[in-house]
UniProtKB/Swiss-Prot annotation:
RNA-binding protein implicated in the regulation of several post-transcriptional events. May be involved in pre-mRNA alternative splicing, mRNA translation activation and stability. Mediates the rapid and sequence-specific cytoplasmic deadenylation of EDEN-containing maternal mRNAs following fertilization. Binds to AU-rich sequences (AREs) of jun mRNA. Binds to the embryonic deadenylation element (EDEN) motif localized in the 3'-UTR of maternal mRNAs. Binds to RNA containing several repeats of the consensus sequence 5'-UGU-3'. Phosphorylated during oocyte maturation and dephosphorylated following egg activation. Dephosphorylation is calcium dependent and correlates with the increase in the activity of EDEN-dependent deadenylation. Keywords: Activator, Cytoplasm, mRNA processing, mRNA splicing, Nucleus, Repeat, RNA-binding. Oligomer. Oligomerization is required for RNA-binding and EDEN-dependent deadenylation. It comes from the Eukaryota. This is CUGBP Elav-like family member 1-B. The lineage of its organism: Eukaryota, Metazoa, Chordata, Craniata, Vertebrata. GO terms for molecular function: mRNA 3'-UTR binding.
Length: 489
């Protein structure tokens, strides 16, 4: 085909103005026309020139408009990234000009839902042709060739597509369909990507919450009896006065533990207490609490009475009622959780002269409470600990005691220190969180380290997070090797 053929005075209404790059600077409109006319009649070629030079010199690129859309697309398919012109090092770059994006296919393509499965492409074209020229119509079909009851059609202009939506959306119910016809703009690639990422994020958050909650229920087995009894007495009948015994240990934070509780949250915490109590083989701590107004008497009874929790793991099935607890307790304020942290400090000072076994038991008990709080209230617990830990832990490389330092591999590329900190803080107090960055590319190496202040938290994190899936990969979480080893992991 050449430029001497008969053709209209103007290009077709759906023609495309194309940008062409990687053109020899020595080429004029004549050489370019000879190249492109083999694909169709050329309406116009405009070589971009540097006007600051005299005479103006080609910039090595141009705009070209064919008389037909078909010719432009054929030229693009044959030349773009395919043909290298004389004297050039890279192949031709050919794509619609920026001005053509206003008429992109995605802006003119419609999705048609609730289509009768008896309809074919011609039926759809006939139904919508009243609104303008249709470039393409396609019925979605399954592997068996049967219609899926939906279709795509592409008009030559966006205004035609808009008229079709206005006139046809839910205007009729087709044969064999339970709802009126659906006519809307088809999802763009960007829309599809956003939906996919949103769904993936929701799934990951659900998995993370589930892992935090059920992976740490074993921590309830280490709760000292007085904590379970205190929780049960506190929440039953909305009686909050029993928390007054915590004031000497937690100060104003003990009040904060109750200020955010409503009736529904109290009821669910009572469910927790009842379920946890079912896992115990002794009621002595509960009676000790009921007859005592001093926290020291509770601690004394804890230290002198044996706590037989060895068989409690067999009763963990009774904790199934906790599944809805995380959502129901969403109204707890950050001060409530801060009270738990303050409680730990108060207990430590109150027991400075206590026996080693008593202090160890209470340390385990607090660890269980801390992990349960993270499981039941992941979002708020994270907020509280971010304010307490985030300033010092994120980005630092301090090490915790032996057995409390973790190596994490297969992290998402976009994860930073704060993301790593937030993911692992539900399992205990974090000393440091560090994602390693490639100094050359300034990109994450997809691994990092977490250090807790105790080995119990590290083991809880391994149990819940090792193998946890994020995107297409699963986290690898393991103890960091000793300094004496040749490799840190």
């Amino acid at each position: 085909m050449n430029g001497t053929m008969d053709h209209p005075d103007h290009p077709d209404s759906d023609s495309i103005k194309m940008f062409v790059g990687q053109v020899p600077r020595s080429w004029s409109e004549k050489e370019l026309r000879e190249l492109f006319e083999q694909y169709g009649a050329v309406y116009e070629i405009n070589v971009l020139r540097d006007r600051s030079q005299n005479p103006p010199q080609s910039k090595g690129c141009c705009f070209i408009t064919f008389y037909t859309r078909k010719a432009a697309l054929e030229a693009q398919n044959a030349l773009h990234n395919m043909k290298v012109l004389p004297g050039m090092h890279h192949p031709i770059q050919m794509k619609p000009a920026d001005s053509e994006k206003n008429n992109a296919v995605e802006d003119r393509k419609l999705f048609i839902g609730m289509v009768s499965k008896k309809c074919n492409e011609n039926d759809i074209r006939t139904l919508f042709s009243q609104f303008g020229q249709i470039e393409e119509s396609r019925i979605l079909r399954g592997p068996d060739g049967m219609s899926r009851g939906c279709a795509f059609i592409t008009f030559t202009t966006r205004s035609m597509a808009q008229m079709a939506i206005k006139a046809m959306h839910q205007a009729q119910t087709m044969e064999g369909c339970s709802s009126p016809i659906v006519v809307k703009f088809a999802d763009t690639q960007k829309d599809k990507e956003q939906k996919r990422m949103t769904q993936q994020l929701q799934q990951q958050m659900q998995q993370l919450n589930a892992a935090s909650m059920w992976g740490n229920l074993a921590g309830l087995g280490s709760l000292a009896p007085q904590y379970l009894a205190l929780l049960q007495q506190t929440t039953s009948s909305g009686n909050l006065n029993s928390l007054s015994g915590l004031h000497p240990m937690g100060g104003e934070y003990a009040t904060g533990m109750t200020s955010g509780l409503n009736a529904m949250q109290l009821q669910n915490l009572a469910t927790l207490a009842a379920a946890a109590s079912a896992a115990q083989n002794t009621q002595s701590a509960g009676s000790a609490l009921a007859s005592s107004s001093s926290p020291l008497s509770i601690l004394t009874s804890s230290g002198s009475s044996p706590n037989s929790n060895n068989s409690s793991i067999n009763h963990m099935a009774s904790l199934g009622a906790l599944q809805t607890l995380a959502g129901a307790t969403a109204g707890l304020n950050v001060g409530s959780l801060a009270g738990m942290a303050a409680l730990n400090g108060g207990l430590g000072s109150s027991l400075s002269n206590g026996t080693g076994s008593t202090m160890e038991a209470l340390s385990q008990a607090y660890s269980g409470i801390q992990q349960y709080a993270a499981a039941a209230l992941p979002s708020l617990y994270n907020q509280s600990l971010l304010s307490q830990q985030g300033l010092g832990a994120a980005g630092s490389q301090k090490e915790g005691p032996e057995g409390a330092n973790l190596f994490i591999y297969h992290l998402p590329q976009e994860f930073g220190d704060q993301d790593l900190l937030q993911m692992f803080m539900p399992f205990g107090n974090i000393v440091s969180a560090k994602v390693f960055i490639d100094k050359q590319t300034n990109l994450s190496k997809c691994f990092g380290f977490i250090s807790y202040d105790n080995p119990v938290s590290a083991q809880a994190a391994i149990q819940s997070m090792n193998g946890f899936q994020i995107g297409m990969k699963r986290l690898k979480v393991q103890l960091k090797r000793s300094k004496n080893d040749s490799k840190p992991y």
